[in-house]
């Protein structure tokens, strides 16, 4: 016995609009998750170095005086950058303001490590944008590897006792650096 065609269960066909809506929904959820988990430039991030002794900084000095991080006895911002990096260019005035302010008291300084860039481009960058601090050549990336640099700009704040206390990704501001220093100074004063 067969069922008449009018009583047969209709075959469901997928509609392209349903698939498109599903794909758009999945992509929207993915982008929202990405947005909320990758807030760059506005926060400190964890790293395996935070709480540990800072690695050395080596390489040819391109600008400024030779500097030994192990004998700093003050706060040091170690900044990894390149002249072709847009966020690096954007953060440079903040680093310059921090360096100038703390040069007055001598309690902190900035050093930069070039990441995949040319010495002539770095010289031109500092000549045009200012900044009077020590700049190390990249030493073929060994220093960046020692510090665990994944992308630039990355900055590390090292305490006067040589411990890495914070890591900043995708740019840092003078206010962020000063806030971390103040929080440690407050703890020391308590």
Regions found by a protein language model. Give the residues of each.
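Structural microenvironment flanking redox-active thiols in thiol-disulfide oxidoreductases
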Residues: 89-129, 139-145
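N-terminal targeting signals for export/organelle localization
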Residues: 1-56, 190
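Short pre-active-site segment immediately N-terminal to redox-active cysteine/selenocysteine motifs
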Residues: 74-76, 81-84, 151
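A short beta-strand-turn-helix
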Residues: 56-76
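Short acidic-hydrophobic, aromatic-tinged amphipathic segments that line or gate anion-handling sites
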Residues: 59-60, 134-138
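Thiol/disulfide oxidoreductase modules built on the thioredoxin-like
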Residues: 124-131, 138-190
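C-type cytochrome heme c attachment motif
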Residues: 83-90, 154
């Amino acid at each position: 016995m067969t069922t008449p065609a009018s009583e047969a269960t209709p075959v469901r066909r997928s509609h392209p609009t349903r698939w498109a809506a599903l794909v758009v929904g999945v992509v929207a959820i993915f982008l929202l998750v990405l947005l909320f988990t990758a807030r760059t430039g506005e926060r400190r991030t964890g790293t395996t170095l935070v709480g540990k002794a800072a690695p050395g900084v080596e390489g040819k000095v391109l600008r400024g005086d030779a500097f030994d991080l192990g004998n700093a006895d003050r706060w040091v911002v170690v900044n990894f950058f390149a002249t072709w990096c847009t966020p690096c260019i954007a953060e440079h005035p903040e680093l310059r303001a921090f360096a100038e302010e703390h040069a007055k008291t001598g309690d902190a300084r900035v050093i930069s490590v070039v990441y995949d860039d040319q010495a002539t481009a770095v010289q031109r960058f500092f000549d045009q944008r200012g900044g009077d601090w020590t700049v190390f050549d990249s030493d073929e990336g060994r220093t960046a590897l020692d510090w665990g640099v994944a992308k630039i700009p990355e900055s590390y704040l090292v305490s006067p006792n040589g411990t890495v206390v914070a890591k900043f990704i995708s740019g840092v501001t003078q206010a962020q650096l000063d806030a971390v220093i103040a929080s440690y100074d407050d703890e020391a004063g308590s």
